[in-house]
C-alpha cells in the first residue's frame, strides 16, 4: 500500500509539474504599425525584417513562449500623425513614427531639425543623438509619463536634399516657390523666402503632380521610393543633414504585462535595431542617389557658397527654438547644446556656429 501511495503522489507531482510547464508557455500576438509603408520608408523595412523578425525568433529560441506580429504599415491602422496616440491607446502595441509629425507633443524631440546642416552621415547623426538621449533621460521618460509608451530605439532619415520641378542655382531662385515638407523642417524654407507647405510623403506625389507645390525637402531614398522624380526631376544635393527623428516605441502596459524574459528580448532587439539604422541608412543614401539617377532624375550638387549662405540665413533659428522650448518648461538649451557638442565629437564641422543664447 505504501508503494502504491508513493507512486500516486509521484504521479500527481509529475502531472502538476507538466501542467505548470504548459501553463507558463504563453503565446502573444502583437500589433506593430507605422503610417509609412514598408519599402519606400527604410525604417519601416527594418521594423519588419529585423525588429519583428528578431523578437519572434529570439523568444522562440530562448524562452518557452511564442510571439507573432500582425504588421500594419502604410497607415492601415494608424497614419503618420496618429502613431504616437495609437500606441498610447493600445490600438497598436508597437509603433514606428517620425517625431516630425508631433511638433507640439514632442516639440523638443525634434531638436535635430532645429540645427540644420548637422552630421551628413546617418551613422554620425544617430551616434550624436544617442549621446543626447543618454545625457538627457527626460527625452525618454516623458514618453512613459505622458504618452504611456516605452522608447525602444532611434531611427534616422538619411541626409536631406531638395527636389524641384525646375532647376535652380541660387537661394534667390527659390523666393516665392512653394515647397513641401514635414513640420519642423519647414522653417529651412521660410528663412530663404520660399513658401513652405506642410505635407506628408503619402500625399506628395499627387500634390507635386497637380501643382499644390513644386518641390519637396526629402532624402533620396524616399524621394525615389515615392517616385517624386517623375513630377519633380531636379534633385539638388544641399546637405541639410541626416535627421535622427524616428522613434520605435511599445505600449507601456503591454510591455509590463509580459514575462520578464520577453520584455528583456524586446528591449535588447530595440537597442540593436537602433544600432543597425545608422550604417544601413548610409547605404540607403548612396543606393537612393544611384536609383534616382537610374530613374532619370537630374542630380547636381549646390555650390559651397550657396550652401553657406543658406546656413547663415538659419543662424537665428536654433536660438528661437531653444527659447521656445524653455518657455514651455522644456530643457531646450541643454538638449540642443548637447547635440551641437555631440556632433562635433563624431567629427562634424558646422558651417555656421549656432549661438543658442
Predicted feature locations:
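Signature of the catalytic double-stranded beta-helix
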Residues: 126-140
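Bacterial N-terminal signal peptides that target proteins for export
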Residues: 1-9
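Intrinsic-disorder-associated interaction segments
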Residues: 11, 132, 328-332
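N-terminal secretory/targeting leader peptides
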Residues: 26-124, 139-357
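Bacterial N-terminal signal peptides
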Residues: 9-17
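N-terminal signal peptide c-region/cleavage motif recognized by signal peptidases
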Residues: 20-22
